């Protein structure tokens, strides 16, 4: 046997056969073992070669496999198994016959199909094939059909057997079986593809467009037209096969294997009796595929000769970027294809596409998708999912919304789940109490049984209602699925000219089922209307199976973080009271708070310009008046976290070249792939507050970059990607003109007089360019803080200290007397420095003494710290005597109320 030249797969088949014989304890290797090894060939793609041949010969492949396994089990076995398995006379004869066949066919090696071809010369295998319904003549024809005209001239020649079935997907067959989604629109692109395919030379179109615009669907639309005979005569009998480049490359371990596979595919295409059009999705994968860097040819070079001779009809599909990167570099390959540009459809076209796909998604998810949901999906995808393309983004929205409704519907309703949990707990309690003998347990047992009966009585109607709604929904879902199948059968019958079946389905089966679906939908609508009319607790439907605009809004909000959901009552109240919420944190700046609140309300009410940021502000004023604090308060209001904002400190962008840190380094520079600090954060969180702190510190070139952000709500990164900023609030802070605001030039209500305001504005105009200022929504000048404002800020700061103690797990309450608050406000008031000195005063006069008292044991957990005024100074009262460790000798009087003035002088 060692003298026979086997291919790699044939040698592995014999090795597997020996292993099978050894595992069953058989002393000899019989043809049954070889057949079993061929049926369990783990290296084959999909079905095994033997199973494919049996099926092609008209036999029952599954029955043949069962017969081989049954015969294998009945062979005599040894225990313990023999150390060495010998070749039976029947197997030796089978190998000799295979060797003779190899010589007859002038092959260089014995392959798997040689083994299979001589199965009919073995009595045992011949009888098994006969049981499976295979005749010797049909079997021989099937073997030759799989082999084709190929010659076994290499050890891996079997890779090319039945290559089209292994490495391609028949799109025309999928379309015939109704397994492809309908293609709506794209008529111009499909017609252009047909025209290119009908050319005499260069009849290979390549579909180029952005990801998600529907390039693959054009090929599917062409497959649909071919089976509907809606193409010219030269394409009417064609098969459209999609080439799987991944399967071609996968498993090609040695040099030459990949080339062998693709040559087999091309040869089968060329020799096929039916004209074949090859569709290559992601065509750029052909460039370099299979070369392996060892001098091997890539797939593109193997395709070139057939493309040049016009013997191969090929449709390619790739993106603009990948076409430029890979295909344009190979001019010889590029010129053999004719470009067809696939543009992104409009919103109206996308809605039409969604309407065409609606039925497929309804059947798949078992839900009803409203037309308003489709319109909402198209508009929201276009507006908010700017990094993706229609119609793919809109289809994904509808798909996920339908999936969310389906998951909710197939889960048990919360009210029913809670009742059943309660009932289970009561039953467990009853079983435990039944073992007890005391009077208290007996009383509790009686009460538990009564409560269990009440819960069971309450659960029963809800469960019945749930089961009724579920069965009604299931029946409707099954009817829609059945209708989809009948429509596919009717179309197939028309194509096969089976007009009797087509007429039965078209005029009897389908109309009857449509009437049934209409009746079920009517019953459901009637039940829902009755529930709404009754408006009693528990009368509303338990199961929701309709996808509406609200469900689409929720998916968009989940994906982007942008609150596009319908305004709820609680949120409406929050937005209407926004000034009150912000004013509690930002004291004395009513004008700024009102401007910010109005911008957010405009956006959530849908009245803001969709082509600009939500709002852009320039906050000007003295240091410490609350410019940055208002930004934090806004972020806290919108996202419940004051740190949930994009903060750019412009003092870090004082050089010209630092603009690359903002938007990313240009191509060729170090850090190009990393992206910019602004653009990358904005891509991840499109709905955010962007703070440019101390804007006047930045270089003028950096401010120039912000012009497009303020005007069109977009910014182009260093990588050429357009980043959307239309859902961001842009806030810039500046101290320009602060020197005019430090003097006492304001009215009693804290507002700045017109003269001072004009002086500040002149200072701003003198620094910033007109085109920059002209793009800002509102310039807000912050007032100088008054003493009454400082008094209110004291209370806020004390509350912050209280929260800090709680976060550090200190249960100490702080009580500050009104006199102490007034004294702290007086000591912390500074017109030039705003509220920041107050923080230092509170730290020196309240927090430092408290820290000493806590460490000294004079102030303990779950106690109150009393802050009062004694002898004109702030004093924190101790609650206990000092520990006898000398700590009480610290001089508290050394901390006086002049510390603020000393620090600022």
Curated annotation (Swiss-Prot):
Location relative to the cell: Cytoplasm; Nucleus
Chain sites annotated for binding ATP 2: 621-628
Binding site for ATP 1: 209-216
The name this protein goes by in its record: Heat shock protein 104
Gene3D superfamilies: 1.10.8.60, Clp, N-terminal domain, P-loop containing nucleotide triphosphate hydrolases
Chain segments carrying region NBD2: 547-738
Annotated gene: hsp104
GO CC list: cytoplasm; cytosol; nuclear envelope; nucleolar peripheral inclusion body; nucleus; protein aggregate center
Disulfide bond residue pairs: none
GO terms, biological process: cellular heat acclimation; cellular response to misfolded protein; chaperone cofactor-dependent protein refolding; protein catabolic process; protein refolding; protein unfolding
Family as reported in the entry's similarity comment: Belongs to the ClpA/ClpB family.
SUPFAM superfamilies the UniProt entry points to: Double Clp-N motif (SSF81923), P-loop containing nucleoside triphosphate hydrolases (SSF52540)
Alphabetically ordered keywords of this record: ATP-binding, Chaperone, Coiled coil, Cytoplasm, Nucleotide-binding, Nucleus, Repeat, Stress response
Function as written in the Swiss-Prot or TrEMBL entry: Required, in concert with Hsp40 and Hsp70 and small Hsps, for the dissociation, resolubilization and refolding of aggregates of damaged proteins after heat or other environmental stresses. Extracts proteins from aggregates by unfolding and threading them in an ATP-dependent process through the axial channel of the protein hexamer, after which they can be refolded by components of the Hsp70/Hsp40 chaperone system.
Residue ranges of every copy of the Clp R domain listed in the record: 2-149
Organism superkingdom: Eukaryota
